[in-house]
Amino acid sequence: MKNIKTSPYIPTDISIQEIGKNKIKISAYPFESGYAITLAHPLRRLLLGSSVGFAPTALKIEGAAHEFDSVRGIMEDVALFIVNLKSIRFKMRGDAERVTLDYSFKGPATIKGSDLVNDYVDVVTPNQHLATINEDATLTFSLIVQKGIGYVPSEETRNLIPEGYIPLDAYFTPVKKATYEIENVLVEDNPTYEKIVLEIETDGLIEPIAAFKDALGVMQKQMSVFNSEWSVSSAESTSSDEEDPELKPLLQKIEALNLSARSFNCLDRAGMKFVGELVLLGENELKEVKNLGKKSFDEIKDKLEEIGYPVGSDLAEEVSSALQKRLNKLK
């Protein structure tokens, strides 16, 4: 007879194997059925999204006005230059989180990642091609390199860069690849246990095992909120908005306004049930309610003024937000 477990199995085995340059395979097992995917998927997301790296976020090239331009004497147009630049992986020296780098190269020359090394940055992809300069030509450009995590599209930094610079999509993460597989393993004649096989590859900025440990650290910190001291709110406290004296008249049913049958029916057909819904409407929006005539509009306007909330009242942001939440729950 199979024994009934009283607690989940605790994994006991882990192996780490180097399978290439800046590339490792981590195997951990045995996990209860379903547990492996529960852990492997967020670990992969954290590896790709939380690892700290450095990337160019803006570029200015002398003689180029935009990313679809070209520069005389440079074989690559600006678009291809940017593609090549994104493949160059930077590492900032010191504790700075943002630096502006200025470069100028005279042709004929072939510019690679190693040519961008200076007192402020190192390059972990020194052989990556950047540009080819013809004879009698000069390539002058400036870069803004920043520290960050994950991926940040250029739209999010467009308003943060100096005038004249081209914003760039920033790939900060030093993790090039993070994949996992879930395999079954046999434990005490039970084949339903699982193994996580995780492969991690970095660009050389950090070791894969360091990236893995960083991801574990982030996961533990994210989970720590659930391990802090907390208390359970009573049901009464969760409905405290109803007791707010400023919200109370706004949460009344429209019937409380004692409108004429014509005005009430018009609002009812429009799906309006509470006084607060009318107060949140602007004057023009109320006038646009289907079949609401001028006489009914004037009546509603007068009734709302009587309770101290004229049509289009300028409610405080926190009151408006709390009212909207309560109305959504009540409807």
UniProtKB/Swiss-Prot annotation:
Q: What is the lineage of its organism?
A: Bacteria, Pseudomonadati, Campylobacterota, Epsilonproteobacteria, Campylobacterales
Keyword Transferase among UniProt keywords: yes
Organism from which the protein derives: Wolinella succinogenes (strain ATCC 29543 / DSM 1740 / CCUG 13145 / JCM 31913 / LMG 7466 / NCTC 11488 / FDC 602W) (Vibrio succinogenes)
What's the protein called, per UniProt?
DNA-directed RNA polymerase subunit alpha
Q: Which InterPro entries match?
A: DNA-dir_RNA_pol_insert (IPR011262), DNA-dir_RNA_pol_RpoA/D/Rpb3 (IPR011263), DNA-dir_RpoA (IPR011773), RBP11-like (IPR036603), RNAP_asu_C (IPR011260), RNApol_insert_sf (IPR036643)
What free text does the record give on domains? The N-terminal domain is essential for RNAP assembly and basal transcription, whereas the C-terminal domain is involved in interaction with transcriptional regulators and with upstream promoter elements.
Q: Which cysteines are joined by disulfide bonds?
A: none
* Any GO MF annotation of the entry: protein dimerization activity
Enumerate the residue ranges of region (Alpha N-terminal domain (alpha-NTD)). Answer: 1-230
